[in-house]
Regions:
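Conserved N-terminal beta1-alpha1 strand-loop-helix module at the mouth
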Residues: 1-117, 122-197
Length: 197
């Protein structure tokens, strides 16, 4: 099994490049109030050289259709990641993959596609209850997020056996400040963990 790795909340080209070099499978750009927030134009600029085999993910929280259309037009994402209920009010082309976010403590429907499982709040480093995540029936579609870092990602993968892992604050030296060394350590730890499964 190959563990899918997403590095989220990228704001600078050097960190985008570090994530690509480290072997990340997806890169997330946040279009919501956060220390990691970027504009669609900024995201388009720093992601211009991402290879086509790496997914560009637009991360949004309760967006209006107008704000989503701006992101769609300027950034051209491969994936939209948003809370599950947000998708109903958005006009999303079939070419864009949808990753609904389901939060710990809420109901997880039996979804057949990729989804993100995380804590009550995004990007705050709060560790999800891995034990409860491990018993979700469709965790082979789960991208596990919430409180992951280079030191605990292997343990999380071993316990939950998700499709993938997603990190933001766990590879930062401060709020919104990505650390190249931590990005590389996280991807290495996640990719090494798959060998023990």
């Amino acid at each position: 099994m190959t563990v899918f790795v997403k590095i989220c909340g990228l704001c600078e080209e050097q960190h985008v490049n570090a994530a690509i070099e480290a072997g990340a499978d997806a890169l997330g750009f946040v279009f919501a109030k956060s220390p990691r927030e970027v504009t669609p134009a900024q995201a388009a600029s720093i992601s211009a050289d991402i290879p086509s085999n790496i997914l560009r993910v637009a991360v949004m929280l309760h967006p209006t259709n107008e704000s989503w259309q701006k992101v769609l037009k300027e950034f051209l994402p491969d994936v939209l990641q948003a809370d599950a209920q947000d998708f109903m009010s958005l006009d999303i082309p079939e070419s864009v993959e949808k990753w609904p976010v389901f939060r710990q403590g809420g109901k997880i429907p039996n979804v057949s596609d990729r989804y993100v499982f995380e804590g009550p709040q995004s990007g705050c480093g709060e560790i999800v209850d891995w034990k409860s995540a491990s018993v979700i029936k469709n965790n082979n579609n789960m991208i596990l997020a919430g409180g992951l870092d280079p030191g605990n990602v292997a343990k999380a993968i071993a316990m939950v056996n998700p499709f993938g892992v997603d990190v933001s604050s766990g590879v930062e030296s401060g709020p919104g400040k990505k650390d190249i060394h931590m990005i590389k350590k996280f991807v290495s730890a996640a990719k090494a963990a798959e060998k023990s499964l």
